Amino acid sequence: MKIGIVTIVDYTNYGNRLQNYAVYYILHKRYGCKVKTLATHKEKAFCDKNYIAWGKEVFAKYFSSIVPCVAEKRFGNNITRWSNFCNWSKRIPTKHYYGNDKLSEKLNEKYDLFFAGSDQIWNYHFASFRKFNYNYFLKFADNKKKIAISGSFGVEEIPSKWRKVYIDGLSSFSYISVREDAGQAIVKELLGEDVPVLIDPVMMLSSEEWMQVSKKPRVDCSRPYILKYYLGDEAEDDKIDVWARKNGYEVYELLNDKIPELYSAGPGEFITLISNASLICSDSFHCIAFSIIFSKPFIVYNRRGKDMDMSSRLDTLLNKFGFKNRWKHLLNEDEYLICDYELAKKQLQIEQQKFTDYISTVLKKR
C-alpha cells in the first residue's frame, strides 16, 4: 500500500521532525507500507526566493557535513543548526514541491491513502495553515482516502469566521483522530461526531527505538545536568538555575544562541540530551512527551509571549498520564526530582493499543 503523509514540514522544530518520522516509521516499519511525506515549499525557509532556499540546502548538506566547525564559525549557528536538521531528516522520505502552495490533484492517482498529521496542522493562528489549509484538509484527494492521524488544533475553539472552512474540511475525511480533548470537543461541536483522542505518534516508539536514531551531542553528558527547552519568549525559570547549581547540576539550555554546541543541536542530539538529563524543564509539548517516553522527571512551564493559549495541548498529555501536578507553580523544590512512572507506563500501553487499533482499522478497510 502506498501512503502519502501531509504535515507541517519545519526544519527548525524538534517536535515537528520527530512526529513526522514517527508516522513514517509506524506505517512503513510496522505495517510494511510505502510511505512518503508530501510537502510544498518549506515553511520558515531562510528566504522567500525558492531557488535561494534550495541553494542554502545544497550548501548546508555538502559543506557543513564535511567541515561543520568551519561552517559554524564562518557562516553562523543558524545554517549549522539547519544543516543538522536536514541531515537527520534524510531518514524521512519526502517529496518537495517547490513554488507550489497546493498539492496537485494528480497525486490522488499515485497513492492509496493520505494521512494528515500529526502536529498542529489545523491551528488557524499559523501562517502555514492560512496558506496551506487546502493541503492539510487533503482537498486534492478523494474523500475515501483521507485519514487524520492525531491531528491538533492547538486551540480550544474555532472563531466564527473560520467555521465554514473547518466544517467543509473536516467533514470530508473518512477517518478522524485528534491529539487533544479540546480537539475532540471542536469536532463534536462542528460535525456532531465523536472522534477518538490518540497519543502523539512519537509515543508509539519505545525509548530503544528512539535511541537508534539519536546522536551524541557536542556537550558533556557524563555529568549530571538539567535540560531547559523553552519555545516561548520568556519562561518563569528564574529560580531553577539557582536550585540546579546549589544541587550540583549543570544547566543546558537548548535554543541558547550563545552556546553553539547546544543551539545547533539537531533532532538526534535532542533525543540524547533528554535521555541523559536528570531533569527537564520545558513549555514544549514534544519535549514533555519525550520526557515521558524516557521516564524522566520534568517541570512544565507556561508559555509566555504568545497571542494564543496553547495549554490544552499539554493539559491532555499531563492528565492522561497522571502528571497534572507537574506544572511549575504546583511543585515545591523537594518534588522536582520525584516523578512516579508506575501508572504512566501502564497507561502508555493502553494508549498505544488504541493507536494501533485505529491504524489497523483504517488499513484493513483498504
Each language-model region and where it sits:
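Active-site anion-handling motifs in enzyme catalytic cores
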Residues: 1-366
